[in-house]
């Protein structure tokens, strides 16, 4: 898979007065180089329509679109991949359905899950939540930057840090060994989405982390 550094996940509850397309396009223009549609509440047809909108956007800017959990929607819009949680469809089954050419990401909260995901053939893993977060319901306790250090030392596939990452603490995340960061509310809930992403992009560039 193509490498990435700044990952944005949808969260429409954080921008009720702005369209999904407008917010995500601003994020891309600010430096986001991979996007994920995450929608646990809408009816399937609505999720499909959102996926079509985002797929058109992803193609326009030549970046990957990942669909969270909805493997049928991912197939329907020919998304670049899917992202699965620990309680979602098993990685081995998802790979049979998606094929070898699609991206499969797995959320992990401890090193044993990271090892299992790598062994099972995941293309990347999510590492988190690093800090407390209100963007996801039923979220596990923060894993802290210590987990980033573990993964950076032991896991060879790409990993992305997620969970409560903000401008005031992102340096801690990078200091721990992360080279890819992912956010929901800090990006899509920002007053200036493009400007916020540009700041994160600059921080990454100053660290020598290219897109």
UniProtKB/Swiss-Prot annotation:
Its UniProt entry gives the catalysed reaction(s) as: 2-[(2R,5Z)-2-carboxy-4-methylthiazol-5(2H)-ylidene]ethyl phosphate + 4-amino-2-methyl-5-(diphosphooxymethyl)pyrimidine + 2 H(+) = thiamine phosphate + CO2 + diphosphate; 2-(2-carboxy-4-methylthiazol-5-yl)ethyl phosphate + 4-amino-2-methyl-5-(diphosphooxymethyl)pyrimidine + 2 H(+) = thiamine phosphate + CO2 + diphosphate; 4-methyl-5-(2-phosphooxyethyl)-thiazole + 4-amino-2-methyl-5-(diphosphooxymethyl)pyrimidine + H(+) = thiamine phosphate + diphosphate
Q: Which cofactor does it need?
A: Mg(2+)
Q: Where does Mg(2+) bind?
A: 69, 88
**Single GO BP term:** thiamine diphosphate biosynthetic process
The cross-references to Pfam families, in alphabetical order and at most eight, read: TMP-TENI
Q: Which Enzyme Commission number(s) are listed? A: 2.5.1.3
Q: In which pathway does it act?
A: Cofactor biosynthesis; thiamine diphosphate biosynthesis; thiamine phosphate from 4-amino-2-methyl-5-diphosphomethylpyrimidine and 4-methyl-5-(2-phosphoethyl)-thiazole: step 1/1
Q: What class of enzyme is it?
A: transferase
Q: How is the cofactor bound?
A: Binds 1 Mg(2+) ion per subunit.
Q: Which UniProt keywords apply?
A: Magnesium, Metal-binding, Thiamine biosynthesis, Transferase
Binding of 4-amino-2-methyl-5-(diphosphooxymethyl)pyrimidine, residues: 36-40, 68, 107, 136
InterPro entries registered for this protein in UniProt: Aldolase_TIM, ThiamineP_synth_sf, ThiamineP_synth_TenI, TMP_synthase
In its UniProt record, a GO molecular function of this protein is:
magnesium ion binding
Q: Where does 2-[(2R,5Z)-2-carboxy-4-methylthiazol-5(2H)-ylidene]ethyl phosphate bind?
A: 133-135, 164, 184-185
Q: Name one GO cellular component term.
A: cytoplasm
**Family to which this protein belongs:** Belongs to the thiamine-phosphate synthase family.
Database matches in NCBIfam families: thiE
Function as written in the Swiss-Prot or TrEMBL entry: Condenses 4-methyl-5-(beta-hydroxyethyl)thiazole monophosphate (THZ-P) and 2-methyl-4-amino-5-hydroxymethyl pyrimidine pyrophosphate (HMP-PP) to form thiamine monophosphate (TMP).
Note the PANTHER family from the entry: THIAMINE BIOSYNTHETIC BIFUNCTIONAL ENZYME, THIAMINE-PHOSPHATE PYROPHOSPHORYLASE
UniProt protein name: Thiamine-phosphate synthase
Q: Which organism is it from?
A: Halalkalibacterium halodurans (strain ATCC BAA-125 / DSM 18197 / FERM 7344 / JCM 9153 / C-125) (Bacillus halodurans)
